[in-house]
Design a protein with these regions (language model features):
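Short, well-ordered loop/turn sites that connect or cap secondary structure elements
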Residues: 114-115, 134
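Ferredoxin-like alpha/beta domains used as RNA- or RNAP-binding modules
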Residues: 1-102, 129-201
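Beta-rich strand-turn-strand
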Residues: 105-108
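Glycine- and Gly-Pro-enriched alpha-helical subdomains that act as flexible
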Residues: 118-121, 126-128
Length: 201
């Protein structure tokens, strides 16, 4: 399965949630996508379908392919603690996600591009792997003398919503990954236990 590059609103309408960005439009059009969306009722899903849907929602939210997502899940399962909560912590610890959370990029997709194009550093070293897993204490910044440094800096808009597991220095355009987040602090509406049940079959 290739990474989805189509309209973001279509994905959000499928799930009935603003999982890919701003959801103000949902108040105007929350119908399923398609020609007859307004006349279609959302089906009552069975157990397996609900589990699969939740996995797809998580993959679309964080922009992962199946292989990447399964690898992250397997790592979560190996760690001590609750597997579902570990999964969310690892997804949040991804470099591309953290660049997005800090407000350096307007979306996870844009954050992924910044990382891939070598504009992001971790502890002063360039890291161009979006899936790079941060550890508490890691400092995220922009590459010195980056060709797009000024344009990126000018586009940075610190988020009104603050996340207690990261800290952002607006003046230096640097962020610190303070700790792995507690599940209740992560705003995404993902029922991770359904994903655990799906992969446990």
């Amino acid at each position: 399965m290739a990474r989805y590059t189509g309209p973001k609103t279509k994905i959000s309408r499928i799930f009935g949630e603003p999982i890919t960005g701003n959801g103000k439009w949902l108040t105007k059009n929350s119908n399923p996508p398609g020609m007859h969306g307004a006349n279609r009722k959302r089906k009552t899903l069975g157990e397996y379908a609900l589990q699969l849907r939740e996995k797809q929602k998580a993959k679309y939210t964080y922009g992962l392919l199946e292989k990447q997502f399964r690898k992250t899940f397997d790592e979560a399962a190996r760690r001590k603690g609750v597997t579902g909560e570990n999964l969310i912590k690892l997804l949040e610890a991804r470099l591309d996600n953290t660049v997005f959370r800090l407000g350096i990029a307007p979306s996870r997709q844009a954050a992924r591009q910044l990382v891939s194009h070598k504009h992001i550093t971790v502890n002063g070293e360039v890291v161009n792997v979006p899936s790079f897993s941060l550890k508490p204490g890691d400092v995220i910044g922009l590459k010195n003398k980056s060709a797009v440094n000024n344009s990126i800096t000018g586009a940075v808009r610190p988020k009104n919503v603050k996340f207690n597991w990261i800290d952002f220095n607006e003046t230096e355009v640097k962020g610190t990954f303070i700790a792995y987040p507690e599940r209740e602090s992560v705003p995404e509406n993902i029922k991770e236990q359904l994903i655990v049940e799906l992969y446990s079959k």
